């Protein structure tokens, strides 16, 4: 270990930054957030320093480096564009046994600045020891996506409850189980973020009163249309916290690779026409695992409330009194159309969009007359096997035979393929693609050649 990670208490303590440019400004911002009494010594200053000085937030000392400014300091930073000056600052600080950071010169510094994730009072610091700041930044960005913004509020509130937890729960094991429930309770976190004191108190009392081995919960998470980058931050956080993930065939391998490593995984293989596990059995899996006290994530492709049968699954849980929540996802219509260069609405061509299932219950029938109307875009989910019927019905109810159509296979993924033509060719085009695929019908499809961007990468 080349460096010892420590967190410094700088509030109301004198610190010095030598340099008045953009880099110095970034360092100053961090020290000000930490509550330091800050002096800036430089030949010239960018405007932000003048603003801060006028507000009484720091002191400016114009002129060459004055090492006597270090005499009362706890910490110094050399942030000029002159290596000689930076080395002088480092040497002067070293002689006074003051920790000094030298920007872009870790060997000349007695401490280095990490990349910081601030969820005060929770702080996470990432460092490459000065060898690769870009790598540290990339890791910080990844960690940022895993840590909810409201985590700091939850941590502060936890501090207020520590004495009560210690009094109510006699053993370390009981306290650990309580805190595990506490920190993954989405309702509590949201109530704290909304400053809803009544809801916070109600949720807290419920956490204290329910048995530690209480029933678990189910989180219905939309995985998006395929590209792992389209998974929402909240969705990512949920699959990282899951004890068990129940997932469909439409959830990509890239997304499953983001699931917590020690979480159990149950594949139920649902896709239009390929039901590996009956819906009722899926409902029972969710119920059974939640009743064991597990945190269950039901991971579905797209959005769980748009042709995902999410409502049916939650009705079962609701009837059994199992707590649940829903994390929306980017639905396939939105993702696939965007990655195909097909806007779903456009002032000149479509004032509305209809999301339509091509997989009806036995005896069901669509409202073909309204679907055939002008100035709208139709997106058919699970319609591949019904493409010929869709073509026939739309033409029969008055849609123009030359209406542009597109079929998007494996949308938003590296395997995406788009075939397009006109309505009279829809049945034939459907023979050229495989599920999962969407059918898009409307004049907006004609914009694809101009707006297509994804196939260029």
From Swiss-Prot:
Superkingdom of this protein's organism: Bacteria
Keywords: Cobalamin biosynthesis, Lyase, Methyltransferase, Multifunctional enzyme, NAD, Oxidoreductase, Phosphoprotein, Porphyrin biosynthesis, S-adenosyl-L-methionine, Transferase
Cell cycle as UniProt keyword: no
Signal peptide: none
Modified positions (Phosphoserine) in chain numbering: 128
E.C. no: 2.1.1.107, 1.3.1.76, 4.99.1.4
Single annotated GO MF: uroporphyrin-III C-methyltransferase activity
Reaction it catalyzes: uroporphyrinogen III + 2 S-adenosyl-L-methionine = precorrin-2 + 2 S-adenosyl-L-homocysteine + H(+); precorrin-2 + NAD(+) = sirohydrochlorin + NADH + 2 H(+); siroheme + 2 H(+) = sirohydrochlorin + Fe(2+)
Residue sites binding S-adenosyl-L-methionine per the record: 225, 301-303, 306, 331-332, 382, 411
Region (Precorrin-2 dehydrogenase /sirohydrochlorin ferrochelatase): 1-204
Catalytic residues, chain numbering: 248 (proton acceptor), 270 (proton donor)
Binding-site list for NAD(+): 22-23, 43-44
Record region (Uroporphyrinogen-III C-methyltransferase): 216-457
Recorded metabolic or biological pathway in which this protein acts: Cofactor biosynthesis; adenosylcobalamin biosynthesis; precorrin-2 from uroporphyrinogen III: step 1/1; Cofactor biosynthesis; adenosylcobalamin biosynthesis; sirohydrochlorin from precorrin-2: step 1/1; Porphyrin-containing compound metabolism; siroheme biosynthesis; precorrin-2 from uroporphyrinogen III: step 1/1; Porphyrin-containing compound metabolism; siroheme biosynthesis; siroheme from sirohydrochlorin: step 1/1
GO biological process: cobalamin biosynthetic process; methylation; siroheme biosynthetic process
Similarity annotation: In the N-terminal section; belongs to the precorrin-2 dehydrogenase / sirohydrochlorin ferrochelatase family. In the C-terminal section; belongs to the precorrin methyltransferase family.
Described purpose of this protein according to its UniProt entry: Then it catalyzes the NAD-dependent ring dehydrogenation of precorrin-2 to yield sirohydrochlorin. Finally, it catalyzes the ferrochelation of sirohydrochlorin to yield siroheme.
Name of the protein this chain belongs to: Siroheme synthase
Organism from which the protein derives: Salmonella heidelberg (strain SL476)
């Amino acid at each position: 270990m080349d460096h010892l990670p420590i967190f410094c208490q700088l509030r109301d303590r004198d610190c010095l930054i030598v340099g008045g440019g953009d880099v110095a400004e970034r360092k100053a911002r961090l020290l000000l957030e930490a509550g330091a009494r800050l002096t800036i010594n430089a030949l010239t200053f960018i405007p932000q320093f003048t603003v801060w000085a006028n507000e009484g937030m720091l002191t400016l000392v114009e002129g060459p480096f004055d090492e006597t400014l270090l005499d009362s300091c706890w910490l110094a930073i050399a942030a000029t564009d002159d290596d000689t000056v930076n080395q002088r600052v480092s040497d002067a600080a070293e002689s006074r046994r003051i920790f000094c950071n030298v920007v872009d010169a870790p060997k000349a510094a007695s401490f280095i600045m990490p990349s910081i994730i601030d969820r005060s009072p929770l702080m996470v610091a990432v460092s490459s020891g000065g060898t690769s700041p870009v790598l540290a930044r990339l890791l910080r960005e990844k960690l940022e996506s895993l840590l909810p913004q409201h985590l700091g509020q939850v941590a502060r509130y936890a501090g207020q409850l520590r004495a009560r937890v210690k009094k109510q729960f006699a053993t370390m094991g009981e306290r650990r189980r309580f805190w595990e429930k506490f920190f993954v309770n989405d309702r509590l976190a949201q109530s704290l973020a909304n400053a809803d004191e009544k809801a916070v108190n109600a949720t807290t009392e419920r956490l204290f009163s329910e048995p530690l081995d209480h029933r678990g919960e189910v989180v219905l998470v939309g995985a998006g249309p395929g590209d792992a980058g389209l998974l929402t931050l909240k969705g990512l956080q949920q699959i990282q916290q899951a004890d068990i993930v129940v997932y469909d065939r439409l959830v990509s391998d890239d997304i499953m690779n983001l699931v917590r490593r020690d979480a159990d995984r149950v594949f139920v293989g649902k896709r239009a026409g390929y039901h590996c596990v009956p819906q009722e059995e899926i409902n029972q899996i969710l119920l059974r695992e939640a009743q064991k006290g597990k945190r269950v994530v039901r991971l579905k492709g797209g959005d769980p409330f748009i042709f995902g049968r999410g409502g049916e699954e939650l009705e079962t849980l609701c009837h059994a009194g199992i707590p649940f929540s829903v994390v929306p996802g980017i639905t396939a219509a939105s993702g696939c159309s965007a990655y195909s260069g097909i806007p779903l609405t456009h002032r000149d061509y479509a004032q509305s969009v209809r999301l339509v299932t091509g997989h009806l219950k036995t005896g069901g029938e669509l409202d073909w007359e309204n679907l055939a109307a002008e100035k709208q875009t139709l997106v058919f989910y699970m319609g591949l096997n019904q493409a010929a019927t869709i073509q026939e019905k739309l033409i029969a109810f008055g849609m123009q035979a030359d209406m542009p159509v597109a079929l998007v296979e494996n949308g938003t993924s590296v395997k995406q393929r788009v075939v397009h033509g006109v309505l009279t060719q829809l049945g034939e085009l459907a023979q050229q693609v495989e599920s999962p695929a969407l059918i898009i019908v409307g004049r907006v499809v004609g914009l694809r050649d101009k707006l297509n961007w994804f196939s260029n990468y």
